[in-house]
Amino acid sequence: MQTKPYKYNDMNKFNLLLVSTVLGTMSVGAVAPRGVDRANLDPSVRPQDDFYDYACGGWMKANPLSDEFSRFGTFDQLAELNRSQVYELVTGLDASKAAKGSNTQKIGDLFALGMDSVRLNREGAAPLAADLAVIASTPREKVIELMATMPGIDAFFGTGVEADMMNSSMNEMYWQQGGLGMGDRDYYLEDSEHAKAVREAYKNYLLTVAKLAGYSEADAKRLVNNTMEIETALAKAAMSREELRDPAASYNPMTIAELATRYPSVDLRRYFSLQGINDIDRLIVGQPKSLAAVDSIIANASEQALRDYLAAGYISSAASFLGDDFINANFDFAKVRSGIKQMQPRWKRALSVPNGMLGEALGQLYVEKYFPATSKEKMVTLVENLRTALGQHIDNLTWMSDETKAKAHEKLDAFSVKVGYPDKWRDYSGLIVDPKKSYWENVQQAILFNMNYNLSDFHKPVDRERWFMSPQTVNAYYNPLTNEICFPAGILQAPYFNPDADDAENYGAIGVVIGHEMTHGFDDQGRQFDKDGNLANWWTEADAKAFNELAEKLADQFDQIIVAGDTHANGHFTLGENIADQGGLRVSHTAYHNSLKGKKAETIDGFTPDQRFYLSYANVWAGNIREAEILSRTKSDPHSLGRWRVNATLRNIEPFFEAFDIKAGDKMFRPVAERVVIW
């Protein structure tokens, strides 16, 4: 699970605890063959020594990184295929002939605005002028009002509506730390060479876009210095990503009256009133220390410093939707942070806006053309097979009492399953896309529309039929607040799911994804929520202690991994995903053998069923990645890198050793006493 500050400009929802299989992403159009694709293998490597290189080395050599990507793997291949399919759908729409206000008109016009480079370059910074003028005259006491009313401004904190962790049937308002232009606090606080390089690139970026927005050289330098000073103060007060993994620590309900007394410079009653929320008397504060820092900064920083910081956040939010000068400055920063060498083509960048802002509208078109009903039926069957297998694993646990096992079964039985697409599509009739206005102004309207959509849930019962990913998304998730697992249509394709592949391969791929999401319900965060999605302790003290001891050992294993140079993996940050990877593999392997019903599966192309199962899993994570991206993801991504999702996870799994005859002395071998098995 990942806890992430809410930003309206890059998220269409406010979700504190949504857990996805991957954070990242086949121009592949070919159907995956039945049996192992030997072209993916590197036969020069013994599977007993480095299973990842053996299983994926051929693919890695055949697919070197292009300049457009800082990381590219089979997952990204599928994401690229889906992107091409969505592009065909969008370019096939004729917005000029569509009824005004229709989804077709909105999607088509929004995409066309992003593609019109001539107009974007001609307009330059003009779309920012009015809002920047407002920011430039904003007094200290109006900072909070500005944040409440200016769509797209990224500053200080985020707020949004989500299910109450203590009463998951009702929606409540949350406050979360934010306001960091570089995204992660470590970039401000660390002295590593990578962090220092990213800081310098960020300052150069701010200087460039400020001057493009009309600031003089001297004023732009002042803006950079003031912004870095405020953001560094926020970073020092922010919780680390490891600390954010504790949901209880981020649950601090306070009354509005109490907030007004403690944090007088952050007038949250006024803030919410301006957003149309007048009946709020209570707010769940994620990080009180961060809120105290915001209060202190607003009270004590100079008005000019506050204005510069607000302007920097605003310009940065808009930069991707302006002319090439802004785009190039943004990309220069990205090059340093991730190692990417070439910008995405314009059509991909333009497509991401309607795909994100009107995701379900495009999703409806996507499933009509690309998602067969038979895939949904087969997935539902697979999910139930995995549910049964996880129940067997719970029964067989030696470290858990019968009392806690009974509660675990209750939670497993209560899992809600979503496959393919929602039964009810979202209504976008309230969103206005006006091609006469600038691209950025239309994006602001979409941000405002999605913000109001979220706020409309305040103090209402939780809608458990709502989806938190669009159908065309190549991903899957578990949401502990609704105790649901979701598998969008986009991921139900090769290499994850192939109706023509044999069962061993499908269980090794999509089966593991299913098991992964189910296991999230019982990882270090998910286990703290009950069957109804409430933050509640259903464990005996002894069982909780046993779980924590096993989890700590698994975290320590991953902490020992060197990912680049002298940088280690962060096993505590990635703990939930590592637990889910292991659980997914073990449970799916059991489900596969259950499906055989005592029959012996055939050997295909010289590979036994179990060998095909584990090769299928490894091939899902085949990929190449740049060192800068490794360093960036180690800070920001709660998933381990693909290599270690394979090698480090498999080294704890006995059936894998048996499948590939791994013995003491082999590099993949781990002594029984050192293995960690949780679920």
Annotate each language-model stretch with its function.
Residues 22-34:
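Bacterial Sec-dependent signal peptides at the C-terminal "C-region" and cleavage site
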Residues 68-90, 218-237, 506-512, 610-614:
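Short secondary-structure subsegments characteristic of cysteine-rich extracellular domains
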Residues 40-61, 188, 192-211, 575, ...:
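Hydrophobic/aromatic-rich, well-ordered segments within soluble, folded domains that form packed cores
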Residues 92-381, 385:
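Noncatalytic, helix-rich "gating/capping" subdomain that lines the substrate-entry/channel surface
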